[in-house]
Amino acid sequence: MSSPRPSTSSTSSDSGLSVDTTAYPEESKYTSTAPGAGGLSDENRYRDVEEGEAGADEPFLPSAKKQAASGSRTSRLIWGLVILCVAGWLWGLVLFVTQNRSAQQSVSEALQSHESGAISGSSSSGKPVTLEQVLTGQWLPRSHAVSWIAGPNGEDGLLVEQGEDQGKGYLRVDDIRSRKGDATSQESRVLMEKAIVQVDGRTIFPVSTWPSPNLNKVLLLSEREKNWRHSFTGKYWIFDVATQTAQPLDPSNPDGRVQLAIWSPTSDMVAFVRDNNLYLRRLSSKEVVPITKDGGADLFYGIPDWVYEEEVFSGNSVTWWSGDGKYVAFLRTNETAVPEFPVQYYLSRPSGKRPPPGLEDYPEVREIKYPKAGAPNPVVSLQFYDVEKQEVFSIEAPDDFEDDDRIVIEIVWGTEGKILVRATNRESDVLKVFLFDTKARTSKLVRTENVADIDGGWVEPTQYTWFIPADPSNGRPHDGYLDTVIHEGYEHLGYFTPLDNSEPILLTQGEWEVVDAPTAVDLRKGIVYFISTKESPTERHLYQVNLDGSNLKPLTDTSKPGYYDVSFSHGTGYALLSYRGPSIPWQAIVNTETDELKYEETIEDNAGLARMVDSYALPTEIYQNVTIDGFTLQVVERRPPHFNPAKKYPVLFYLYNGPRSQTVDRKFSIDFQSYVASSLGYIVVTVDGRGTGFSGRKTRCIVRGNLGYYEAYDQITTANLWGEKPYVDETRMSIWGWSYGGFMTLKTLEQDAGQTFQYGMAVAPVTDWRHYDSIYTERYMHTPAHNPNGYDNTSITDMTALQQTVRFLVIHGASDDNVHIQNTLVLVDKLDLAGVQNYDLHFYPDSDHSINFHNAHRMVYERLSSWLVNAFNDEWHRIADPVPDDSMWEKVKRSLPMLVN
């Protein structure tokens, strides 16, 4: 990480922490301060969240009045016993009433007795954040996705807008230059007048639209049905802009469900996939030409299978048109050897099929081809379709990986039939880049990187390689491409030219990293735009650099913390710049033609969100870092409103901590963690431990082969540091996470064995990496055959250690197609065998990894909230070892409800 900017921060030592002490307005994401706050005294500035209530160490006892001397020792003894009995009865009554009232109140009502007072970042009369607001998205910033599109003749600054807008039509192409005034550009046009379309007497309600490159046609999708996370099926239609009429994509099969449809660059053809076969529709006729014919349950053409969709492409397409429309490249995926995993649905029918009569009460079972770690992977190969010759062909690659050891991660078309193919071995630590020539039908290996030898790490399956065509008049005599390369322990931009050159021109370097780069390239000016962490691992700023590596400079304000992303117009003359935090997010269209960004139009200022911030008592976020074993790790601490440093607060740790992930960043966010701090009054801490991204390869790659060990150590060490703080109650500490965070919760509790964390909440956890999919798992763990000890070490196996915690909670969706319920069931069996009972378990029927079937999503968070309150109220201590009690005291307690009611 680069040093903090001296103008805004300094570094100090606090309990072994290296702390970023930036002034509050830049420390917190929220800068709304109530008027008059500065006039409060130190005594009044901090208010106890539960001020006025009896503290845990100050039990309510009635004051004893001095009794007159009776002269009789017996009398004094009797009166003393009577007083003690009455006092005991009153104490029991108080406890019962308090507990009964607490049980009847909601979690928020029970714990949000805030005293009014102003602090930095919170309104003096502010209301606490509610769970309802978080779950219904009321705190989400408004944002707009701009769909930039190239004009038919390469015009720049055009964008597609969908939705009724003051009679301007449903689907429009607008010229950004005409939006500021009343003038209408020649390039602005209406593509669809209305949101509904009539086709042969049928009413079509499009849910998605894709204009053709020449803007004369629009591809429409209706009746969309979800498949997996990114994939779906639907019915497709071709809409004619001139006549405002539509026809089926396949006139001979209008009701056929299509899995993918893509325009050709020449706007006269559509490639589409149905029933796992690839087809071509020429708009000049109604005929549909099958490109492949043997697709089916085990063979996929043009679309990914489950594991490639989830772990490689994060999308539903593995079909790529060449720029001139003469070729279609696509992947052939053979799943024949991949084992199946059954996912059961007890209430729903994802297939849409009714069961046969008499079988209505049986669950629907969906058999998914799911390769677990060590199991056979799908065999993937690249094929091509010559549009003119109407033939499918393949090109053999020299020095290619074997079929069972190949993962194709990216395809990039160049010019003149050239195509770059990036592939890795099964364990994702050797990268090979091939150059194919579809005209000559030849190929060669142009680059190999053995990442295992470089730093012991892995190759992430990203798709950001950018082809740079030759332009001798502009200083580019040869074709080339931009790719991310490892340089001195950090990921930077490299420019490879000619295409077969294996040594790049470094465009960036230093102890920081580029992120999903490049973002855009201005070929006319020879400028590369990219987002990076140059200022801080938790920030994102926009930069530009020339193709020769000169003139690197920021385009966003780096004088203060910021988190930006950007999307450029087709010609890079304009961009949608999105500021995500730490202050109120905004979006603006900017002009990039000048040396400095010129703001053309603000399209979102989130004024409503700003008003909410002024009205609510939000947590204060303190960004810090800790140094553990020489590694600098980013931390954010969320303090409750009216934070009182003299009070002892419970602490909840929230984590994800998956490889290359990031949770601690400067984006504006009001989420479940914010609710816990604001409404429940607890401190919430997140530390991005080793293995997470954007702090260099050394920090990231150390976890390879032993997931969970260093990450858990970092959580425990940080929790111990927090436990030493005077305002932290080290006897009430919990940790929670979802998915990889669920695994990390259990792994941390296992490694800690109750020494630091008393509680934990794990949602949809992996408990044994042999149960998770091969491509993700083996990237970080190698194969089970290669690393058997690593798999043993990283599994949740020490039930005795889990028994040392006070209590933990495990939640899982019963129909999770990603992290199978098998993970939790295997864990439960281990707990049963060990006789461990200090846990709670809840399953949600028919819910996948997101747990949202029926009312499940709300119920998950309500359960997490109430369970956490019970934990920090010491309820789990009370029920740890239940025994029958028929004493007189218990009988009196059981009689109290009648007296109360």
Swiss-Prot record:
What is the annotated localization of this protein? Vacuole membrane
Q: Residues in the active site?
A: 739 (charge relay system), 816 (charge relay system), 849 (charge relay system)
Q: Where are the transmembrane segments?
A: 77-97
Keyword field? Aminopeptidase, Glycoprotein, Hydrolase, Membrane, Protease, Serine protease, Signal-anchor, Transmembrane, Transmembrane helix, Vacuole
What is an example of a GO molecular function annotated in this UniProt entry?
Answer: serine-type peptidase activity
Predominantly, its location class is membrane
Annotated EC: 3.4.14.5
The record lists glycosylation at 334, 625, 793
Q: Where is the composition biased (Low complexity)?
A: 1-22
Q: How does it sit in the membrane?
A: Single-pass type II membrane protein
User: Which family does this protein fall into?
Assistant: Belongs to the peptidase S9B family.
- One BP annotation, GO: proteolysis
InterPro entries in UniProt: AB_hydrolase_fold (IPR029058), Peptidase_S9_cat (IPR001375), Peptidase_S9B_N (IPR002469), Serine_Prot_S9B/DPPIV (IPR050278)
Q: What catalytic reaction does the record list? A: Release of an N-terminal dipeptide, Xaa-Yaa-|-Zaa-, from a polypeptide, preferentially when Yaa is Pro, provided Zaa is neither Pro nor hydroxyproline
The protein here is known as: Dipeptidyl-aminopeptidase B
